[in-house]
Structures are given as C-alpha cells and as structure tokens.
C-alpha cells in the first residue's frame, strides 16, 4: 500500500500543564490552532504544507499528535476556531492559499522562470507546461472535416443528458476511421478527460484529479482484448472511484452522471461487462 501523502492535515495534540510551543518549519505554508478542553487539554489545529508530504513526515513535524488528512480545508479551519470548547487562541502561522490561488501562484512561477522551475521541481514544471499547452490547443483547434455518419451519431448521443448506466462503445475494426482523432478533438473541450488506457491504478489516479469529467478511452490497436480495464470503465460510470495510488481514497459522486465513451478496434467482452450497458456505434 503506497504511503499516504497530502497537503492539508488536521491534528490533535493532547497535553497537560503549560501549552506546548510549536515551531513550524519552512515546509509549512499555513497553520491555525487553538487550546481546547473537552475532558482534557489539547491543541486542535489545521496545517497546509507547501507540497504533498507523507504521514511519517507530519509525525516528525508534530511528535505525539494525532494526524489525519483534511478533506475539506475550509471546514477544518472553521473547526479550529469553534468557541464552545476554546480556552485560548486561535493562533495562526503563515498565509493560507486557496486551491485556485495556489494554481495561479504556480503558473506565475512558471511564467517568470520556467527553466528554474524545471531544475528545482521537474514534475511541477511538466504539469504547468501541460496546462499551458492545453490552453493554447483549445484556443486554436477546430474540426475542419466533414463529419462521418458515426461521428454525427456520436455527437447527437452525447448532446443528450448522460444516464447512470450507458457506456458508449465506438467500434471500428479496420483502422483509419477517425476514432483517435475524434476522441482527441472531443477531449479538448472543457469538462472532458482523455486516456489511452493503461494500468487501472494509473487511470483511476489520473481521473481522480478531476473526477467530474466526461471520459474518452481511446484503446490503441496494439492492446490485447484481455487487458481492457472494464473495472475502471464501470467505476467511472457508476460514480464510485477507488484511487489507491499516492493518496488512497474513495470518491463518491452519486447523481452526477457522465458520458463514458470507449473507442476500440474490437467489440466489448460481454462476459466481463453487462451487455445491456453497452451502446454500440459502428464506424
């Protein structure tokens, strides 16, 4: 099981006697905490780190504290300021960065010094570069071809509201029908996610970064039929996404149906997925 890693954390630090002094390191972006008493004295707090860190690192930062990932940072901050059990505080350290402003700050860093970011944090550099390239392509890309009958049928299908069951399977056995080109074109639109398949853990982790998107799964011709991840297809369609990579979590999004489209050179294996879920569109 991968180590738990997160940016946002909640902590409870029990103590007796004088209030413990906390010395934050430069890795801490922001923290808020207060002295509370509910049967015993403790510090209740929230921490925002500059980057994802492991639970082990957090325990080194706050020895003896009980730590959990904060899934709702704003609510965690409010919880650390509740008056009912407060004795002293709250105290604050640093400046809290909301998720939107954090992205803007990162993009400003990238624009001001891309080569410096490339050396300091290659992973962050690649993510920022990807965001810039996607924005440019979205602004310039148009579909300059006549729609084939199957493409017209697909567009009419996805113009309808998605239901909680139907998986659209675009089938073209010969190649050259325009499946991959159309999948990439569709996913240039906001609210769509593209993948060429792969390991289930990688696919679910990538999708969990923006789990409200409609999905195009563009299966390469070289993929063997037995390697199709039907479990991933059904998890996304069922709106229960179980991500076990880096930050294990289960994402429930009941009631928010999305279109799931599979572009493939072979028909679905109905021994591995319910036949009545599949809508075939022939190229």
UniProtKB/Swiss-Prot annotation:
Motif (RCR-3): 79-82
Positions that bind a divalent metal cation: 36, 42, 84
Residues annotated as catalytic: 79 (for dna cleavage activity)
Motif RCR-2 location, chain numbering: 42-44
Residue stretches making up the CRESS-DNA virus Rep endonuclease domain: 3-96
UniProt cross-references to InterPro entries, sorted A to Z: CRESS_DNA_REP, Helicase_SF3_ssDNA/RNA_vir
A GO MF label: RNA helicase activity
Record's keyword terms, sorted: ATP-binding, Covalent protein-DNA linkage, DNA replication, DNA-binding, Endonuclease, Helicase, Host nucleus, Hydrolase, Metal-binding, Multifunctional enzyme, Nuclease, Nucleotide-binding, Nucleotidyltransferase, Transferase
Cellular localization per UniProt: Host nucleus
EC number: 2.7.7.-, 3.1.21.-, 3.6.1.-
Its biological purpose: Initiates and terminates the replication only of its own subviral DNA molecule. The closed circular ssDNA genome is first converted to a superhelical dsDNA. Rep binds a specific hairpin at the genome origin of replication. Introduces an endonucleolytic nick within the intergenic region of the genome, thereby initiating the rolling circle replication (RCR). Following cleavage, binds covalently to the 5'-phosphate of DNA as a tyrosyl ester. The cleavage gives rise to a free 3'-OH that serves as a primer for the cellular DNA polymerase.
Protein name: Para-Rep C7
Higher taxonomy: Viruses, Viruses incertae sedis, Alphasatellitidae, Nanoalphasatellitinae
């Amino acid at each position: 099981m991968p180590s738990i890693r997160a940016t946002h954390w909640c902590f409870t630090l029990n103590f007796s006697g004088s209030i413990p002094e906390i010395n934050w390191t430069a890795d801490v972006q922001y923290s808020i905490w207060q002295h509370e008493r509910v049967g015993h004295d403790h510090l209740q707090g929230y921490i925002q780190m500059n980057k994802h860190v492991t639970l082990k690192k957090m325990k080194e930062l706050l020895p003896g504290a009980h730590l959990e990932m904060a899934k709702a940072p704003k609510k965690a901050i409010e919880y650390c300021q509740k008056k009912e059990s407060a004795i002293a505080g709250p105290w604050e350290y640093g400046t809290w960065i909301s998720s939107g402003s954090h992205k803007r700050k990162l993009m400003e860093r990238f624009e001001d010094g891309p080569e410096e970011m490339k050396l300091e944090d290659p992973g962050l550099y690649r993510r920022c570069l990807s965001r810039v390239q996607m924005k440019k392509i979205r602004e310039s890309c148009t579909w300059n071809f006549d729609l084939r009958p199957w493409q017209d049928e697909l567009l009419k299908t996805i113009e309808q509201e998605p239901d909680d069951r139907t998986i659209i399977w675009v089938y073209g056995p010969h190649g050259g029908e325009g499946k991959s080109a159309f999948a990439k074109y569709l996913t240039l639109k906001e609210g769509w996610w593209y993948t060429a398949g792969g390991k289930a853990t990688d696919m679910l982790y990538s999708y969990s970064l923006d789990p409200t998107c409609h999905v195009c799964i563009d299966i390469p011709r070289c993929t063997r039929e037995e390697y199709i991840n039907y479990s991933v297809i059904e998890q996304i369609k069922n709106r229960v996404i179980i991500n076990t990579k880096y930050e294990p979590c289960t994402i429930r999004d009941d009631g928010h149906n999305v279109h799931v489209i599979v572009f493939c050179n072979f028909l679905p294996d109905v021994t591995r997925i319910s036949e009545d879920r599949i809508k075939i569109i022939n190229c």
